[in-house]
From Swiss-Prot:
Record region (G5 motif): 324-329
Coiled coil: none
Post-translational modification: Myristoylation at Gly-2 is required for membrane anchoring before palmitoylation. Palmitoylation at Cys-3 varies with membrane lipid composition.
Segments for region (G2 motif): 173-181
Region (G3 motif): 196-205
UniProt keyword annotations, A-Z: Cell cycle, Cell division, Cell membrane, Cytoplasm, Cytoskeleton, GTP-binding, Hydrolase, Lipoprotein, Magnesium, Membrane, Metal-binding, Mitosis, Myristate, Nucleotide-binding, Nucleus, Palmitate, Transducer, Transport
Binding site for GTP: 43-48, 150-151, 175-178, 200-204, 269-272, 326
Summary of subunit composition and partner proteins: Heterotrimeric G proteins are composed of 3 units; alpha, beta and gamma. The alpha chain contains the guanine nucleotide binding site. Part of a spindle orientation complex at least composed of GNAI1, GPSM2 and NUMA1. Identified in complex with the beta subunit GNB1 and the gamma subunit GNG1. Identified in complex with the beta subunit GNB1 and the gamma subunit GNG2. Component of the TAS2R14-GNAI1 complex, consisting of TAS2R14, GNAI1, GNB1 and GNG2; within the complex interacts with TAS2R14; this complex plays a role in the perception of bitterness.
Organism expressing this protein natively: Cavia porcellus
Tissue expression notes: Mainly expressed in the brain, lung and kidney.
Protein name: Guanine nucleotide-binding protein G(i) subunit alpha-1
């Protein structure tokens, strides 16, 4: 009797092969779909990372889109100088030149127009004179004692350019804008044959209850920490040190049962601001037990250890840490390339393809 397969057997073998092939294709497709959740406390740089994805992996911001940010740039600039002027009263700092008190009064009268996307020559002149004042600069140097936008100096130092009537914000200007994220912002892009869905959620305490339904099927979490927050308090709770709040949040995410199999990528962000700040503001403000030097390398490494030590599953879970400057496109491009390689490796492993 021969070993020839009957037609039914042949069909069954073909069907089996097809099922295997489909399963493999489904597995590969699943391995190519990446759901990334961006988490972190308020103002840690999450939204800036999303903007960088648009610049790096899409066509960036068109001239039309940049124009739409003009009102935000003006609003951020005005709010920054107003925050400094208000803090001067609280910190009992006088203007270097008493004539600036009139400019400060004018500022409050003229501020409304800039919120609408217009910067008059009169308003630009008022802001410029105020920003040059020695008392204003003294107050700016004490900005850890009040809430001030990170981009304050960036915009105020460039007032001549941004006050031009034909001003169109650059990609860097757009990156520097600050708008509080409310709700969830979803971004899609393709990179290294992977289809990314990135979710940016508001970091302020009031926004966190909206995270929960994003948790399912997450490939990786990018958790952003602002290194430069070590000597600041929260906007929503002036008793709470921002770095301690970040650590509390990271602890709850890193050791959450939802994320047992989720890659956790830690972005220690704003390294440029931290490098400047650590020279004059000691790390002991945040970590009284710290005995190291106030050099960037040693202080940054200490903060890294503080976060990584919160991981209660060190034997099975690795934290992938990167030092970042979210406003630096080249740095973000380099880091995201490394992050993607980790995701590819872990994804293939999960799908049994590695």
């Amino acid at each position: 009797m021969g070993c020839t397969l009957s037609a039914e057997d042949k069909a069954a073998v073909e069907r089996s092969k097809m099922i295997d092939r489909n399963l493999r294709e489904d597995g590969e497709k699943a391995a190519r779909e990446v759901k990334l959740l961006l988490l972190g406390a308020g103002e840690s740089g999450k939204s800036t990372i999303v903007k960088q994805m648009k610049i790096i992996h899409e066509a960036g911001y068109s001239e039309e889109e940049c124009k739409q940010y003009k009102a935000v740039v003006y609003s951020n600039t005005i709010q920054s100088i107003i925050a400094i002027i208000r803090a001067m009263g609280r910190l009992k700092i006088d203007f270097g030149d008493s004539a600036r008190a009139d400019d400060a009064r004018q500022l409050f009268v003229l501020a409304g127009a800039a919120e609408e996307g217009f910067m008059t020559a009169e308003l630009a002149g008022v802001i410029k004179r105020l920003w040059k004042d020695s008392g204003v600069q003294a107050c700016f140097n004490r900005s850890r004692e009040y809430q001030l936008n990170d981009s304050a100096a960036y915009y105020l130092n460039d007032l001549d350019r941004i006050a031009q009537s034909n001003y169109i914000p650059t990609q860097q200007d757009v990156l520097r804008t600050r708008v509080k994220t409310t709700g969830i912002v979803e971004t899609h892009f393709t990179f290294k044959d992977l289809h990314f869905k990135m979710f940016d959620v508001g970091g302020q305490r009031s926004e966190r209850k909206k995270w929960i339904h994003c948790f399912e099927g997450v490939t990786a979490i990018i958790f952003c920490v602002a290194l430069s927050d070590y000597d600041l308090v929260l906007a929503e709770d002036e008793e709470m040190n921002r770095m301690h709040e970040s650590m509390k949040l990271f602890d709850s995410i890193c050791n959450n049962k939802w994320f047992t199999d989720t890659s956790i990528i830690l972005f220690l962000n704003k390294k440029d601001l931290f490098e400047e700040k650590i020279k004059k503001s000691p790390l002991t403000i945040c970590y009284p037990e710290y005995t190291g030097s106030n050099t960037y390398e040693e202080a940054a490494a200490y903060i890294q250890c503080q976060f990584e030590d919160l991981n209660k599953r060190k034997d099975t879970k690795e934290i992938y840490t990167h030092f970042t400057c979210a406003t630096d496109t080249k740095n973000v491009q380099f880091v995201f390339d490394a992050v993607t390689d980790v995701i590819i490796k872990n994804n293939l492993k999960d799908c049994g393809l590695f």
